[in-house]
């Protein structure tokens, strides 16, 4: 057993696989997006997700002003887009790299996402370095792509949907 310091916690979390998502928003403060794996279901009544966003992230000021977002869960083959949205690239360049539609909330919805959850942000809670956004899902768009994209052991991996 080891003490849970920052480094050991990060190393341990590398062993926990997660879907890769691009979180987007648009509104008075502008259009923004970032890559996130810290996204999960909270409840289905009402349908709610949580999204974690570091307050030191360049996109935080935009998301802090908006009340809607879209969680775009990536499919296999979208690693480059994930990397682009996870870096310091200008927003216009990030969004120019893929095809987007406007979702039910007005947020950018990735056309080729495995699934997109259009959300209204109902609550924000600050914990440590991050804000936790509780997001009420108002619309869902699914893509028939059978392969998901996962982040595990500090790398991308493809997950196949089982054949029926």
Curated annotation (Swiss-Prot):
GO molecular function, one term: FMN binding
Keywords: Flavoprotein, FMN, NAD, Oxidoreductase
Catalytic activity annotation: FMNH2 + NAD(+) = FMN + NADH + 2 H(+)
BP-aspect Gene Ontology terms: nitrogen utilization; uracil catabolic process
One Pfam family it belongs to: Flavin_Reduct
EC number: 1.5.1.42
InterPro entries (UniProt xref): Flavin_Rdtase-like_dom (IPR002563), NADH-dep_flavin_reductase (IPR050268), RutF (IPR019917), Split_barrel_FMN-bd (IPR012349)
The protein's role, per its UniProt record: Catalyzes the reduction of FMN to FMNH2 which is used to reduce pyrimidine by RutA via the Rut pathway.
Family, per entry: Belongs to the non-flavoprotein flavin reductase family. RutF subfamily.
Protein name (database record): FMN reductase (NADH) RutF
Organism: Klebsiella variicola (strain At-22)
Lineage: Bacteria, Pseudomonadati, Pseudomonadota, Gammaproteobacteria, Enterobacterales
Name of the gene this protein is made from: rutF
């Amino acid at each position: 057993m080891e003490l849970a310091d920052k480094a050991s916690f990060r190393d341990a979390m590398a062993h926990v696989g997660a879907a890769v998502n691009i979180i987007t928003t648009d509104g008075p403060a502008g259009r923004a997006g970032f890559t996130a794996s810290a996204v999960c279901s909270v409840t289905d009544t009402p349908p709610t997700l949580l999204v974690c966003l570091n307050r030191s992230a360049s996109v935080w000021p935009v998301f802090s002003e908006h009340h809607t977002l879209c969680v775009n869960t990536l499919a296999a083959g979208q690693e480059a887009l994930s990397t682009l949205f996870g870096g310091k690239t200008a927003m216009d360049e990030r969004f120019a790299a893929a095809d987007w539609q406007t979702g039910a909330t007005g947020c950018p919805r990735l056309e080729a996402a495995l699934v997109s959850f259009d959300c209204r942000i109902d609550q924000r809670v600050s914990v440590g370095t991050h804000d936790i956004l509780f997001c009420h899902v108002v619309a869902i768009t699914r893509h028939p792509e059978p392969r998901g994209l996962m982040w595990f052991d500090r790398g991308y991996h493809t997950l196949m949907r089982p054949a029926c």
